Amino acid sequence: PIAGSMVLAAILLKLGGYGIIRMVQILPTTKTDLFIPFIVLALWGATLANLTCLQQTDLKSLIAYSSISHMGLVVAAVIIQSPWGLSGAMALMIAHGFTSSALFCLANTTYERTHTRILILTRGFHNILPMATTWWLLTNLMNIATPPTMNFTSELLIVSTLFNWCPTTIIMLGLSMLITTTYSLHMFLSTQMGSPMLNYQTEPSHSREHLLMILHIIPLLMISMKPELVI
């Protein structure tokens, strides 16, 4: 069910991040060198989750692994225990909560019309539902953290934190962000471009679907314009 996926990605996964933030506060702040293995594992896990996204043929699986990769960055930033790291982690959890929920919503919009989640079978939607293509583009741009969105602000804070802590981490961070951009564009092009593979009668997009997307994107853009509300 799509509602379960949206709640899981937007709220429950972030509750785990909140739990990590509360737990880290009781750890010694001066001994961050002890946490090197955990930070390396978090960054490596984010990179592996991104690589797994590139291999997915199922749309919902791709979005789910995308959420996991972003949580790897959150964990790495939280463990360092700097003010910028905590602010970036909080901002990324909020921003990605909106983004991943919107992506699941769009995936369901596609599934209701094609009755399949296989990427190659859902192509050609820019000719059929041009407004939905606009939502896909906006949401994917947010997913790859383009400015001036909240995703960009949060990832910039996390990158600054990790680079100040250890400049070598920029290698894994850069690789992770490059792969994120690759699979996001792959997802957009696979679902929207080309000619439709299946011969089916497609009903037009409904007002409720546009309203759902507006309720995801407008709050995120408003928070992006005034990030001090959450940072």
Swiss-Prot record:
InterPro entries: NADH_UbQ_OxRdtase (IPR003918), ND/Mrp_TM (IPR001750). Belongs to the complex I subunit 4 family. GO terms for biological process: ATP synthesis coupled electron transport; electron transport coupled proton transport. It catalyses: a ubiquinone + NADH + 5 H(+)(in) = a ubiquinol + NAD(+) + 4 H(+)(out). The keyword NAD applies. Its EC number is 7.1.1.2. This is NADH-ubiquinone oxidoreductase chain 4. It comes from the Eukaryota. Keywords: Electron transport, Membrane, Mitochondrion, NAD, Respiratory chain, Translocase, Transmembrane, Transmembrane helix, Transport, Ubiquinone. The keyword Hydrolase does not apply. PANTHER family: NADH-UBIQUINONE OXIDOREDUCTASE CHAIN 4 (PTHR43507:SF20). The gene is MT-ND4. GO terms for cellular component: mitochondrial membrane. It holds the Pfam family Proton_antipo_M. It is a multi-pass membrane protein. The chain crosses the membrane at residues 1-21, 34-54, 61-80, 84-106, 118-138, 156-176, 211-231. Core subunit of the mitochondrial membrane respiratory chain NADH dehydrogenase (Complex I) that is believed to belong to the minimal assembly required for catalysis. Complex I functions in the transfer of electrons from NADH to the respiratory chain. The immediate electron acceptor for the enzyme is believed to be ubiquinone. It is found in: Mitochondrion membrane. GO terms for molecular function: NADH dehydrogenase (ubiquinone) activity; ubiquinone binding.
